[in-house]
């Protein structure tokens, strides 16, 4: 059976390409989603991409994932990385393997960005590879999860 991957992007990631391009690059979220969908499709997998600026909407999407037959989640939680216990709890409650992705290297940035509420329960964490981090996460999910 084909793998089913859910790609989640949190607050402000809809601004990729225009928000601080010196930090996040010039690729847009549409570029990321298009490349991710194509990568999964070429491997015979299904990838569904979803972005929201709202914590509760992301939690609802995570909770629905198990019922939808999602096999793995790739999530860039944006700023919720450093503040959302609720997002962590939602991911823990569905017990689906997930990879945390960050476009920038959060450990080279402001001190408040160094802590992630999600990393401790993630299968893996990828940061600082630009949008190539998504490619790496999808590749890992397809091979290992």
Curated annotation (Swiss-Prot):
List, alphabetically, the CDD domains matched.
DHQase_II
The record ties this protein, via Pfam families, to: DHquinase_II (PF01220)
Origin: domain of life: Bacteria
Which residues catalyse the reaction?
Answer: 24, 102
Instruction: Name the catalysed reactions.
Output: 3-dehydroquinate = 3-dehydroshikimate + H2O
Swiss-Prot/TrEMBL site (Transition state stabilizer) positions: 19
Q: What class of enzyme is it?
A: lyase
Concerning Gene3D superfamilies, the annotation shows:
Dehydroquinase, class II
Entry binding sites for substrate: 76, 82, 89, 103-104, 113
Question: Is Protein transport there in the keyword field?
Answer: no
What Enzyme Commission number(s) apply to this enzyme?
4.2.1.10
GO MF annotations for this entry? Answer: 3-dehydroquinate dehydratase activity
Q: Does the keyword Transmembrane apply?
A: no
**Keywords, comma-separated and alphabetical:** Amino-acid biosynthesis, Aromatic amino acid biosynthesis, Lyase
What family is this protein classified in?
A: Belongs to the type-II 3-dehydroquinase family.
Q: How does it assemble?
A: Homododecamer.
Question: Which HAMAP family did the record assign?
Answer: AroQ (MF_00169)
Q: What is the documented function of this protein? A: Catalyzes a trans-dehydration via an enolate intermediate.
Instruction: Show the NCBIfam families listed in the entry.
Output: aroQ (TIGR01088), PRK05395.1-1 (NF003804), PRK05395.1-2 (NF003805), PRK05395.1-3 (NF003806), PRK05395.1-4 (NF003807)
Query: What name is this protein filed under?
Result: 3-dehydroquinate dehydratase
Query: Which source organism does the UniProt entry give?
Result: Herminiimonas arsenicoxydans
Q: What is the lineage of its organism?
A: Bacteria, Pseudomonadati, Pseudomonadota, Betaproteobacteria, Burkholderiales
């Amino acid at each position: 059976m084909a793998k089913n991957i859910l790609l989640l992007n949190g607050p402000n990631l809809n601004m990729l390409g225009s928000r601080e391009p010196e930090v996040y690059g010039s690729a847009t979220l549409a570029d990321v989603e298009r490349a991710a969908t194509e990568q999964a499709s070429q491997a015979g997998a299904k990838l569904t991409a979803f972005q929201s600026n709202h914590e509760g909407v992301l939690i609802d999407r995570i909770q629905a994932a198990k019922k939808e037959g999602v096999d793995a989640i790739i999530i860039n939680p944006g700023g919720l990385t450093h503040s959302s216990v609720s997002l962590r709890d939602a991911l823990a409650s569905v017990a689906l393997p997930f990879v945390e992705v960050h476009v920038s290297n959060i450990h080279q940035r402001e001190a408040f960005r160094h802590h992630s509420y999600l990393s401790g329960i993630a299968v893996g964490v990828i940061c600082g590879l630009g949008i190539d981090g998504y490619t790496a996460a999808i590749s890992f999910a397809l091979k290992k999860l």
